[in-house]
């Protein structure tokens, strides 16, 4: 049986925006490092998002009007929180549905049996 300790960056890159949108739809607002740690925790370390991958995606989602930002001073640090806009909430659902359908198609294509969870 194949065991992958961490998924390839190519696989993650294609789903990163959807991952971010999904997390923000469940958590209202999050800051960048919090997003990376949440993904790492939820996937038992199989998906580790680097800052170099995350922040360009966050900025792209913000430029697309899907995210809004708010900065807060935490001690001597400035922390930037991201949250979904109304449009972002709608697009999040579309992206999640699209990815779910894609995974089901890949499962069929590769003749895989659904995993028991």
Language-model features: locations:
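Basic, amphipathic "hinge/linker" alpha-helix immediately C-terminal to the N-terminal HTH DNA-binding motif
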Residues: 77-96
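Beta-hairpin "wing" of winged helix-turn-helix
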Residues: 62-78, 83
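Short, contiguous hydrophobic alpha-helices characteristic of membrane insertion segments
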Residues: 9-10, 58, 66, 116-117
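Amphipathic alpha-helical dimerization/coiled-coil segments
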Residues: 2-3, 90-117
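Basic amphipathic alpha-helical segments that dock to polyanions
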Residues: 54-61
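Short, Lys/Arg-enriched N-terminal segment that forms or immediately precedes the first helix
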Residues: 1-9
């Amino acid at each position: 049986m194949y065991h992958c300790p961490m998924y390839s960056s190519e696989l993650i890159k294609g789903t990163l925006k959807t991952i971010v949108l999904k997390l923000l739809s469940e958590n209202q607002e999050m800051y960048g490092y919090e997003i990376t740690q949440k993904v790492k925790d939820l996937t038992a370390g199989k998906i580790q998002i680097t800052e170099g991958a995350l922040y360009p995606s966050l900025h792209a989602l913000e430029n697309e009007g899907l995210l809004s930002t708010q900065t807060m001073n935490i001690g001597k640090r400035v922390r930037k929180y991201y949250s979904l806009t109304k449009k972002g909430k709608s697009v999040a659902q579309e992206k999640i549905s699209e990815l779910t359908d894609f995974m089901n198609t890949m499962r069929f294509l590769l003749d895989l049996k659904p995993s028991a969870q």
